[in-house]
């Protein structure tokens, strides 16, 4: 489980004290071997229980487990950095050659895949596969790059016999959402989870009794709160928005895994 990634992606939902803890852990990750929760609490002016609760919020049993995991992640990250001439999160610049751009893009996509797979809840995926396999009708929603991912998934699902709608027009998406029934499934794809059109479709689907499955980031969002199930994706941020490309890579890895799981389930 990549806790540094979870911290970065969950920042939008942190309280003031939680943000202090997150900032400390990221800034001092190389020094955590010699830091106790008591020392950390004193330095930040917060209670030890706040630190323990923060660790548990991220999925650790307590601060000790979180601290050891972060130390391990830091060591692994250093080894990877030393093994390549490119920094993991280096941005593409106007001076880069095509070869350097290709290497940076490939590394960004590799990182998105590694982090998405590391954070994946496979038990939840199995449950989602069971729900989709019983659905009389499936709607897939998304905008921009997410819509392309959705269209690809819709073609795959139709090939194996599912009734699927994946419309590019947002008005048509809304209309289809309002016609869903109990037992139907809506798969909403949005990395931010805050696109108004996608959120409105999810609200309509829930109102109709359909099951909403969101393929989205770890950050708290309206779509995440509406969904019955979530499939988490992770993508870095860079200056030239290779993030949108790595986001699509992460989303495609999730939808491909979902598709193969459904094929096996048949």
From Swiss-Prot:
One of its GO terms (molecular function) is DNA binding. Gene3D superfamilies: Glucose-6-phosphate isomerase like protein, domain 1, Winged helix-like DNA-binding domain superfamily/Winged helix DNA-binding domain. Residues 1-77 form the HTH rpiR-type domain. InterPro entries: Homeodomain-like_sf, HTH_RpiR, RpiR-like, RpiR-like_SIS, SIS_dom, SIS_dom_sf, Tscrpt_reg_HTH_MurR, WH-like_DNA-bd_sf. It comes from the Bacteria. The keyword Transcription applies. One of its GO terms (biological process) is carbohydrate derivative metabolic process. Residues 128-266 form the SIS domain. Residues 37-56 bind DNA. Keywords: Carbohydrate metabolism, DNA-binding, Repressor, Transcription, Transcription regulation. Pathway: Amino-sugar metabolism; N-acetylmuramate degradation [regulation]. PANTHER family: GLUCOKINASE (PTHR30514), HTH-TYPE TRANSCRIPTIONAL REGULATOR MURR (PTHR30514:SF17). Homotetramer. Represses the expression of the murPQ operon involved in the uptake and degradation of N-acetylmuramic acid (MurNAc). Binds to two adjacent inverted repeats within the operator region. MurNAc 6-phosphate, the substrate of MurQ, is the specific inducer that weakens binding of MurR to the operator. This is HTH-type transcriptional regulator MurR. The gene is murR.
């Amino acid at each position: 489980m990549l806790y540094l990634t979870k911290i970065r992606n969950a920042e939008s939902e942190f309280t003031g004290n939680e943000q202090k803890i997150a900032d400390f852990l990221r800034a001092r990750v190389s020094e955590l071997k010699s830091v106790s929760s008591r020392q950390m609490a004193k330095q930040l002016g917060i209670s030890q229980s706040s630190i323990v609760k923060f660790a548990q919020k991220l999925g650790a049993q307590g601060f000790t487990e979180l601290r050891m995991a972060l130390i391990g992640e830091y060591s692994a990250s250093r080894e990877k950095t030393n093994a390549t001439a490119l920094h993991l999160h280096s941005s593409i610049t106007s001076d880069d050659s095509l070869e350097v751009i290709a290497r940076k893009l490939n590394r960004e996509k590799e990182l998105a895949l590694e982090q998405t797979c590391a954070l994946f809840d496979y038990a939840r995926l199995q449950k989602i596969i069971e729900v989709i396999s019983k659905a009389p009708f499936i709607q897939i929603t998304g905008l921009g790059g997410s819509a392309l991912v959705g269209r690809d998934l819709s073609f795959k699902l139709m090939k194996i016999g599912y009734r699927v709608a994946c419309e590019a027009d947002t008005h048509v998406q809304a209309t289809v959402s309002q016609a869903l029934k109990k037992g139907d499934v809506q798969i909403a794809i949005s990395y931010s989870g805050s696109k108004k059109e996608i959120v409105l479709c999810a609200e309509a689907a829930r109102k109709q009794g359909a099951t909403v499955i969101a393929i989205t980031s770890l950050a708290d969002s309206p779509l995440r709160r509406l969904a019955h199930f979530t499939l988490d994706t992770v993508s870095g941020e860079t200056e030239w928005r290779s993030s949108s490309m790595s986001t699509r890579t992460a989303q495609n890895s999730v939808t491909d895994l979902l598709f193969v799981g459904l094929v096996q389930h048949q």
